[in-house]
A protein has these predicted regions:
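Short cysteine clusters
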Residues: 64
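Glycine-rich nucleophile elbow surrounding the catalytic serine of serine-hydrolase chemistry
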Residues: 68-73
Length: 128
């Protein structure tokens, strides 16, 4: 990854990216149930990291171990918030853009369908 890119890591990376100057680690597990306490807030932190890098004029790399579930969970949330889209629309967008996309983590889907959708709606009501 070029040094001027922002990197949002969603998994344990060991020493990878340790010296990368623009990096945010937001750890989440690709697991069902309560293995991700406060998942909504972790998701919001990841989306805010993407936006912060973009506001700095950086290209952004969002990644997890396999690039299938956590990465697309965060990218769907970002798209929903930035574009005012529904989870179904974000699902279509990611599916069209990313061939590795998979949806096996029901907990992620539930957060996007409920808490995140409510958050997106509330934010867009407040925006002029």
């Amino acid at each position: 990854v070029p040094n001027d890119f922002g990197v949002v890591s969603l998994c344990i990376t060991d020493d990878r990216f340790i010296h990368h100057p623009y990096r945010r680690g937001v750890y989440m597990r690709d697991s069902e149930g309560d293995r991700n306490p406060e998942l909504f807030f972790v998701l919001r932190e990841a989306v805010e990291a993407i936006d912060a890098f973009l506001q700095e004029g950086r290209q952004v790399v969002v990644h997890c171990h396999g690039g299938r579930s956590r990465t697309t969970f965060v990218l769907k949330a970002w798209y929903m918030l930035r574009e005012g889209k529904t989870h179904a629309e974000a699902h279509q967008w990611v599916g069209d853009e990313w061939p590795l996309y998979e949806t096996w983590t029901r907990t992620f889907l539930d957060v996007l369908d409920n808490e995140w959708s409510d958050y997106v709606e509330a934010v867009h009501r407040e925006w002029p």
